Amino acid sequence: MDASYQPEQIEAQAQRYWDEQQSFAAREEREGEKFYCLSMFPYPSGRLHMGHVRNYTIGDVISRYQRMQGRNVLQPMGWDAFGLPAENAAMKHGVPPARWTRENIETMRGQLQRLGFAYDWDREFATCDPEYYRWEQWLFTRLYKKGLVYKKTATVNWDPVDQTVLANEQVVDGRGWRSGAVVERRDIPQWFLRITDYADELLEALDELPGWPEQVRAMQRNWIGRSEGVELDFAVAGHSDTLRVYTTRPDTLYGVTYVGLAPEHPLAAEAAEGNPEMQRFIEDCRKGGVAEADIATMEKRGMDTGLKAVHPLTGEQVPIWVANFVLMEYGHGAVMAVPAHDQRDWEFASKYGLDIRPVVHPSAEERADVSEGAFTDDGVLADSGEFSGLPSAEARQAIGEKLEGLGKGERTVNYRLRDWGISRQRYWGAPIPMIQCPACGDVPVPDEDLPVVLPEDVDVTGGGSPLKDLPAFYQTTCPQCGGEARRETDTFDTFMESSWYYARFACADQKGAMLDERADQWLPVDQYIGGIEHAILHLLYARFFHKLMRDEGLLQSDEPFRNLLTQGMVIAETYYRERGDGGKDWYNPAEVTVQRDERGRPVSAVLEDDGEPVVMGAIEKMSKSKNNGVDPQALIDRYGADTVRLYTMFAAPPDQSLEWSDSAVEGAYRFLRRYYGLVRDHVAAGPVPALDVASLDDAARDLRRKVHETIAKASDDVGRRYTFNTAIAAVMELCNALGKAAANEPSGAARAVLQEGLEAATLILAPIAPHVTHVCWQALGHDEAVIDARWPAVDESALTRDTIELVVQVNGKLRSRLQLPADADKAAAEAAALADEKVQRFTEGKTVRKVIVVPGKLVNIVAN
């Protein structure tokens, strides 16, 4: 071994060995139970950030641990390569998106390899590869023929900056999730996948995913939003039209005081004819998005149409209002408004002076107070005709039956979930494989013409997709009639590619099919790792896509991911100065000097360049916008990959936020250097005799017990609890104990325990710091590489103790500690405690009233 810890040399040596041996190539025929570990693949933005490093280190530690358990492990890596940033970069730098993307992939692949992740690189692909997205196009045409794909003109969220449609999930606080632009409503022809056909299965199967965080399952349940209610019809006075509405609260039907219409509703358009004020209001409503969360928080506005709706049970006429909070895409574009029992309706009615009529009360004796807000709980009906006096639950059933009997409504199930709009008016995405023929309509591209290849040598200038200006791309002939036709110029939502990539990794080299029998061998993924921000986007779409592929006969399993780990964010301090224009200039923590008080708490900060103060902001997620990121490459260059890996696993449990600390990174480096030195000095001391447990003295026996206690703890922490930080802490404690023992120049028998302890520490650290342990394992005398070694086993006999330590308290205060035989009973413990000199100093002259013995732990003496 080298005299000093040289990370760069050690890591190059280990990686060279893994490459030569093809250590991480997954083989279907290999013995052992399969284990498929997958971290969400990255968008090739150009460089790894610390969030990537944390995510992929967690996955790599789990993969390497499972390999040490004898399992046949698959851990692949690829690239989620389509998306808007490539187009933005093309406009900014004049580089085609394809070239920008592939150059970034080269850079990031090198960074991942430098970190020593155990990926099977033979399975690598990028979603922008035509041989990948051809199968996505192929499946789309199958779904079209099944009726699971359809096209309709829909009111959509339009991002005016990115010039594309956004799914509701991609609108955050009324703004586009990438551009930050205020979203508008537009009517655009769109392609949709019928995810609602799978709503019940997607909902019910959540109960079969106990390995998922309950928070994620709850988010999906809420997003799917199954509800049981009634669809009912309000006639329009003086019109042949009826308005169909859906309600989960038919028990409040007698409290309806107005009906709300979506601005896009045909009746609203009719009311606006010859009414410029109404036309302006409807146009103004279209400036907001159609995301439900944003509708809920915006100011409620409306206009009276002058039309009246006829109550289906009482015949009462109530006003019809156009309201900006009613969505055409939800229900039927109309809502029955019950201000007394719905807070949104109450706010609207209060603003415009509409009636508020309570018809449900907390009890028969207690009236609902709706002067300050709606009463939204269940209760007892009043002023509701024949249904007065019924509890809400009974009234819902009875009123539903009444409406059905009159032919004015029906009980039904509804969902918040909408069909998935997958059309995007962008260039850098997979082309939608449809052809528009004047004679035949929409026609899918035949299998023999797939893939529809995205032309890569184009100029991206903004203002929408360049495909619509490329006759060479869109001019084609109809597959059915042979006439002139036009190719679809929209591309798939990029969530399409990430909805099935995990399955393609099982058979990435398959040229003749989307998937083959290897998909059933590897799927479902045993451990999936990624951020909770994907709970209702990627994770729901992937579950849906898995069921589509199953029903196409491509695989047999029902769910894609057996277990899900949602890792916490990497967070760091932020510093800024206010600009004159109200904006902020953000400074990287490395540019700032922080002054701290005597307890180490930050009190002020100055910029190193000029010595002037900066404002200490919140501790936030590392981001470019806040300039509080740390470059992983700089850390690797300075400390080595193993230090970066060790720090990310030690700083916090994987599901919690990791607060960045430069000093803790330095501490991780010092520990690895100390561990390396322990092995080096031990090896330099010469040959080690075989372990003879019978010949060990008490000190060696205690050290051996520490070794096996550490193995037991680490096995549980890494294998079951995923609390890698506590496993690392246990190894650090063990190394401290080994270092103390080594300093005492141990005998031959004790050196055998040192050998056993260093081997155990090496094996436990191997998944976390694989490079230095590769070198140390060989130095400890092993012919096989540590990558092929098994996880250490606990010797239960080593855990037994001849003596135990008991804490002795007098009146609840610690007064002494006793060493007793491990088999000492309560009486012996009590007698020893009362006879102890230290204890007697506190019981002398007092009467012992009670002695409480907790076996193996403590004795508490009550005396006064």
Curated annotation (Swiss-Prot):
Q: Name the source's superkingdom.
A: Bacteria
Identify the residue span(s) of motif 'HIGH' region.
42-52
What is the enzyme's class at the highest EC level?
ligase
Q: Which GO CC annotations does the UniProt entry carry?
A: cytosol
Q: Give the binding site residues for ATP.
A: 624
Set out the biological process GO terms recorded for this chain's protein.
leucyl-tRNA aminoacylation
Sorted alphabetically, which SUPFAM superfamilies does this protein's record hold?
Answer: Anticodon-binding domain of a subclass of class I aminoacyl-tRNA synthetases, Nucleotidylyl transferase, ValRS/IleRS/LeuRS editing domain
- Any idea which GO molecular function terms this record carries? aminoacyl-tRNA deacylase activity; ATP binding; leucine-tRNA ligase activity
Motif range for 'KMSKS' region? 621-625
What is the protein's given name? Answer: Leucine--tRNA ligase
- Recite the lineage of the species: Bacteria, Pseudomonadati, Pseudomonadota, Gammaproteobacteria, Chromatiales
- Encoding gene, per UniProt annotation: leuS
